Amino acid sequence: MGQTPRSAVWGRAHERHMAPTIFDLRNADDARDVIHRAVQALAEGGIVAFPTETVYGLAVSAPCAEAVDRLIHLKGRPEGKPLAVAVKSADDALDYVPSMSPLARRLARRCWPGPVTLVLDGSHPDSLLTQLPEAVRAAIMPEGTVGLRVPAHSAIIEVLRLLAGPLVLTSANTHGQPEAVSARQIADTFGEQIQMIVDDGPCRYGQASTVVRVADNDLRVLRAGVVSEQTLRRLCSMMILFVCTGNTCRSPMAETICRQLLAERLNCSPEELEDRGIVVGSAGIAAMPGGRPTPEAVEVMREDNLDLSRHESQPLTEPLVQHADFVITMTRSHKQAILAEWPSAAARTHLLNIDGMDVADPIGGPTEMYRRCAVQIREALSAWIDKFVA
């Protein structure tokens, strides 16, 4: 006789009216054991409840059509209302939406992991979504778009890393009822109809994710949630980040000159650039927070009617690198250091001088050295302005 399909195990469990097992992450002897149990349950076709930063969610393995079907019926979800797909990272999302627009990539980098679901075109022929069962594709993308999310909770992210394929994820409530924000609510609502609950206490926000439709370079909020539309539109801005060593002379001068050149090109004031969707900043690989610019740099900028006096240095951090659309370095060694630490930023990290020459460090030198440095920066930036406003 053949083996019983693993996905049938949970169906028999339901027939025996087995209550779901609740695993408390906060009091677990080894959280990894909880994660491995969840992975096994999902691989066998079970429905598992997970905490997220928004509300608790019900998840099934996306390749398991039977599990997806049971999830739909458990929720009482209307036909044609799509389920979301959880992936482990913004980079992973590109496997499912290879044609992701620059705006969508920008939002993915800046919002994930986090409480935003991006609704994107899922019809690309190279998408891994094409490998899912037809019934699953109908459930997650009935109109050709797919809602992707990277939840900001370590438990579900670790499960995604260990599981073969993404998760189909939906809020842990029946259709039309309030979302569950605790494990007890889930147990009371669904009882033995789900197989496992991962409990990590109340959810951080207690509110659903914001659902955003991104088409080309336009966005539309489909469902209000944790992240406001105003914040989302701010996150849509193009970010240019200049990097040097201490963030006290070269990179802040580049930031200030770049603001001036962009404002001239766009016929606005430097203060209005953010309203035009452009954010310009700077940081230093070895910078201390709150440092003042060198007096020579302030003086040289003042000669061009630019004010650098209020600048405060900041160290280069992972969020700055990941959020930036352009990371512009003063030297080749700065670029190498960034790529050694954050290799995923390679396509967005560039040397200021397109001819490959470094911008020499004027620190400790006379004012005239700072003037030459400013001239070099201005000349190099002239080749970048068209790219920034394209």
Language-model regions: role of each:
Residues 237-323, 386-390:
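Conserved active-site segments centered on acidic
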Residues 23, 148, 211, 308, ...:
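Short clusters of hydrophobic/aromatic residues that line enzyme substrate/ligand-binding pockets
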Residues 2-12:
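Extreme N-terminal basic, low-complexity initiation segments
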Residues 75, 262-266, 338-342:
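Conserved hydrophobic residues forming the short capping helix/wall of the S-adenosyl-L-methionine
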Residues 10-243:
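Active-site-adjacent structural elements in enzyme catalytic cores
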Residues 21, 166, 196, 279, ...:
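Conserved beta-strand segments of alpha/beta enzyme cores
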Residues 134, 138, 167, 172-174, ...:
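Phosphate-binding/catalytic loops
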